[in-house]
């Protein structure tokens, strides 16, 4: 059975790899395939791109505060991604908050296997990163410390 510390290290590496794949994937879609990102995609990118650097630095420095740096960005990105997917799959109408600048947030660029879309890829990436950070907190034994004076 693996120690809690080695489990924490594994989920940290998974989060880093996921953030790296998400970043490279989004750059591939926009720079190589020339798919212009919509407004919501930009907001999700703003949340995902820094995670690669934050996670890499925390892995190198063996910094235990990594979840407290990553979770705010991943949770904000996850909320935006959930909203984007609800719009994309027409669960909520686009008329509630239309994407008026640039490309529509419901534009279909890819649909692998009939259901895997760019917004779904973002949702999965941010979900994996968020779950990894929650598991990291559990495995690394983080406890909330309250200073009593």
Show where each model-derived region lies.
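Secretory/periplasmic and organellar redox-cofactor proteins
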Residues: 1-40, 48-149
């Amino acid at each position: 059975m693996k120690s809690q510390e080695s489990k924490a290290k594994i989920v940290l590496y998974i989060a880093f790899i996921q953030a790296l794949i998400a970043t490279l994937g989004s750059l591939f879609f926009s720079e190589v395939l020339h798919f212009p990102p919509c407004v919501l995609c930009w907001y999700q990118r703003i949340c995902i791109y820094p995670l690669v650097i934050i996670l890499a630095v925390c892995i190198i420095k063996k910094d235990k505060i990594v979840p407290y740096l990553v979770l705010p960005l991943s949770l904000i990105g996850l909320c935006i991604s959930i909203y984007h997917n609800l719009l994309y799959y027409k669960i909520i109408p686009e008329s509630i908050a239309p994407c008026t600048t640039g490309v529509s947030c419901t534009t279909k660029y890819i649909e692998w296997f009939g259901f895997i879309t760019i917004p779904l890829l973002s949702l999965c990436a941010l979900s994996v990163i968020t779950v990894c950070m929650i598991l990291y907190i559990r495995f690394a034994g983080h406890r909330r410390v309250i200073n009593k004076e």
